[in-house]
């Protein structure tokens, strides 16, 4: 833990069940920053300790850091966990609301990258069109990926392509719908493509191609122009799209249940591989705690001072009525194991998914 990153909120001290923590002045703890720096720069990921359990998942690097959300905010806990599981290949479309405020404050971002420069690609459009915006992100990258698949199949059909390259290409195609396996296959495929593209200088070293190499060099070309090399170059130009992406649409209950419901319903109905995560605080948290359709009957909130007269909208049952949407409701504080199970199953499901995460909030005024 970095002493420079303490927010001073005191939540850890107040919640420690055995009273082991105390608040002290920052100056006395600053020497511990050297330990933090060592852990960040020198200690590598322990892949053999990382699995999809509550404990194992926490050995993975979080790609959401120091968001500045309210003390005890549950939304950031959910988002952080999702980035730990899929952050290096993750797309996020974020509805306007609390999660866009702590997720994208002016001039900075709490979303970060790993040592390879990979991390969540985050974007915020509007309140009312977030689902459609996220669906567009999915469709765009999927179209590029389909083109890469077609070019890979053309590459496999070329007789003189190197066996090692063909093997890596076939492995990439075979794992295209498996996020974790495809990530490793992508690394091997990119390495094989880079190793098997002939440069003009390498071509010139072969006597029968020397004249052609000179012509290419005169045109300013750097690589061989045979079909295999041209396809390999085209694929490498878009190598960032090779790995299977994990597309997530984040937003609160005011968005998913009320203002953006039409878009949520439409996108889920398309039967495409997108994941919708609703941070359900059961009120409009970002604007001060007004009642939403996610508020419970009898709940006291702004615009419902005498208690809400109607019951909570069953968004999960509406989604389940389609018959092909993965639906889960989670509460990390009550059952963290089920939370991880739901998130990983939603990502693994080759179709639309909806996760509704109960998110305790300061607007609940529970002390």
Where are these regions (language model features)?
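Acidic, Ser/Thr-rich peripheral helices and adjacent loops at domain boundaries
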Residues: 35-49, 111-121, 291-313, 367
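Structured alpha-helical segments in the cores of large, soluble enzyme domains
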Residues: 43-55, 141-145, 179-181, 235-241, ...
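N-terminal leader/propeptide and maturation segments of large enzyme subunits in energy/redox metabolism
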Residues: 126-187, 235
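Glycine-rich ThDP/TPP pyrophosphate-binding loop and its adjacent helix/strand module
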Residues: 188, 243-248, 258-273, 279, ...
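Amphipathic alpha-helical binding modules
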Residues: 207-234
């Amino acid at each position: 833990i970095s002493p420079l990153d303490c927010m001073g909120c005191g939540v850890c001290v107040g919640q420690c069940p055995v009273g082991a923590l105390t608040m002290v002045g920052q100056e006395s703890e600053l020497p511990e920053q050297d330990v933090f720096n060592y852990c960040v720069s020198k200690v590598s990921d322990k892949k053999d300790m990382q699995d999809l359990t509550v404990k194992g998942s926490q050995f993975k690097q979080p790609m959401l850091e120091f968001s500045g959300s309210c003390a005890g905010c549950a939304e950031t806990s959910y988002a952080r966990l999702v980035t730990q599981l899929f952050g290096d290949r993750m797309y996020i479309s974020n509805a306007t609301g609390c999660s866009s405020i702590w997720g994208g404050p002016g001039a900075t971002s709490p979303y970060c990258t790993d040592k390879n420069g990979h991390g969540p690609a985050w974007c915020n459009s509007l309140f009312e069109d977030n689902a459609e915006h996220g669906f567009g992100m999915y469709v765009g990258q999927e179209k590029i990926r389909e083109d890469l698949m077609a070019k890979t199949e053309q590459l496999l059909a070329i007789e003189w392509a190197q066996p090692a390259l063909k093997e890596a290409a076939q492995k990439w195609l075979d794992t295209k719908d498996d996020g974790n396996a495809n990530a490793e296959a992508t690394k091997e495929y990119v390495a094989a493509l880079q190793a098997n593209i002939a440069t003009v200088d390498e071509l010139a070293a072969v006597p029968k191609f020397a004249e052609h190499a000179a012509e290419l060099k005169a045109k300013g070309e750097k690589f061989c122009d045979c079909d295999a090399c041209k396809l390999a170059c085209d694929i490498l130009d878009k190598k960032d799209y090779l790995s299977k992406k994990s597309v997530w649409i984040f937003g609160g209950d005011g968005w998913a249940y009320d203002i953006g419901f039409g878009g949520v319903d439409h996108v889920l109905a398309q039967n495409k591989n997108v994941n919708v995560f609703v941070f359900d605080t059961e009120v409009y948290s970002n604007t001060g705690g007004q009642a939403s359709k996610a508020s419970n009957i009898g709940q006291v909130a702004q615009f419902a001072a005498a208690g809400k007269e109607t019951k909570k909208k069953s968004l999960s049952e509406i989604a389940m009525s389609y018959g092909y949407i993965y639906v889960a409701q989670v509460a990390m504080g009550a059952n963290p194991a089920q939370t991880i199970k739901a998130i990983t199953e939603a990502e693994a499901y080759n179709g639309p998914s909806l996760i509704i995460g109960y998110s305790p909030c300061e607007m609940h005024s529970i002390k």
